[in-house]
Amino acid sequence: MHWKMLLLLLLYYNAEASMCHRWSRAVLFPAAHRPKRSSSLPLNPVLQTSLEEVELLYEFLLAELEISPDLQISIKDEELASLRKASDFRTVCNNVIPKSIPDIRRLSASLSSHPGILKKEDFERTVLTLAYTAYRTALSHGHQKDIWAQSLVSLFQALRHDLMRSSQPGVPP
């Protein structure tokens, strides 16, 4: 009887472990994996696939960004905004990254309990969320500024923790 229970527990543990690793990507940014039916958004869009695209993403973040009252992000520089990657940037910023305090706190909590290091696309989206949170912190006043600042710090700590883990030798992704 005890060996049957042990076997059942081992099977359960194995199933639980394999399910956690398989679905951990979708947990952090669910909007990337569930585009709206009416939109032509790509499934799981990624901005950086080469060094040139990383540099372009950096240029997008350094360019003057505009956030409309309905929280849509756009690039003010017309030349940069006309690039194909700028369209992907707008897609990720406007449809994938969280923009409300509860959603950002949920992301921070998920990041703090995330096993292993972040995948490239999750790291990228977390950095964009951090940039958005920094922008909102700068525009806020009083109690709202404190709330945005707390979210900013928690995202920064999660990213720093991920970078520390990824720099250690022998850490699995």
Curated annotation (Swiss-Prot):
The keyword Coiled coil does not apply. Its main location: secreted. Keywords: Secreted, Signal. InterPro entries: FAM180. GO terms for cellular component: extracellular region. Residues 1-17 form the signal peptide. It holds the Pfam family FAM180. It is found in: Secreted. Coiled coil: none annotated. Belongs to the FAM180 family. PANTHER family: PROTEIN FAM180A, PROTEIN FAM180A-RELATED. This is Protein FAM180A. The gene is FAM180A.
